[in-house]
């Protein structure tokens, strides 16, 4: 009973991952599009990490003190997420560079220094590298999408574009919801980890639970964002 809120938090997140995995798998079977397969793997591996915590709290009524089982699942999920971020964009976006992407390490490195004072160095390196890379690619994608939207708007005013002699910018705007969702996901991960360093409580006064509920929402939103990015 002491850990009831914690249990429901993890259970909700696991159910969200299970629903997302089922939905992504169904879309993959229907369309045979690779991003849906990667998304199903993302949901599945992240959900397995959460399931470990859920069962631990349910059966032993205590928060896990050994994180390796869950962290392996979460690190695997970051690999699938990064693979999606490398395969969904166009070749032009992959070549695009922006200095704003450096915001990701500027935020992640100080957080990493904080985390290693509380936890394992090796797994914190892997998890922070994964989330930092995801944030880097998302920021780049958002800047590229903004640039593409501006160029497309200018192109509509161009006579050559109107006559069809100039190529339209294409799909960058379609990836914007996906990049926003991934960026929200990584930001909430950092908020979650940071709150766990300073607050220890099993009540809703602990911001950890609110960040985790929002994280579950961002995980579910990943399915809708990916579907929009894929286009069908």
Place the predicted regions along the sequence by residue:
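Hydrophobic alpha-helical transmembrane segments of multi-pass membrane proteins
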Residues: 12-23, 36-59, 70-80, 178-198, ...
